[in-house]
């Protein structure tokens, strides 16, 4: 589970897990000091507070899970795994947030940055 919990690089983060980890520039989440931020689809949740404004592009309802491919303003495409009781349709708008403690930070060479919190 260490590869999953603490991927050593962007390369490893990109293929361990299904759906794969979302990778984006740190500036997309207000952290220009972090070259790349990784967020696992299951570490994203719907919120009514502060968060990303998104639009669902493709929704897969799988029973216990709902996989949504969303477009995040100023970030790009992101895949999220939500509880199955959350019903979405293509085109729905929702606000999402990611737990900063669950984010993964990578340096300019793609290596894991230890001791970083968002």
Model-derived features: positions:
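Internal alpha/beta loop-helix hairpins
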Residues: 1-32
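Non-catalytic connector elements of ABC transporters
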Residues: 19-22, 30-118
């Amino acid at each position: 589970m260490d590869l999953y919990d603490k991927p050593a690089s962007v390369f490893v983060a990109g293929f361990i897990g299904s759906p794969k980890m979302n990778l984006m520039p740190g500036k997309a989440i207000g952290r220009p000091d972090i070259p790349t931020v990784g967020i696992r689809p299951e570490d994203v949740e719907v919120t009514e507070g502060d968060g990303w404004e998104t639009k669902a592009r493709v929704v897969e309802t799988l029973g216990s899970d709902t996989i949504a491919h969303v477009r995040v303003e100023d970030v790009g495409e992101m895949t999220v795994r939500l509880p199955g009781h959350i019903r979405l349709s293509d085109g729905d708008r929702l606000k999402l947030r990611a737990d900063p403690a669950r984010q993964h930070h990578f340096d300019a060479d793609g290596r894991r940055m230890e001791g970083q919190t968002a």
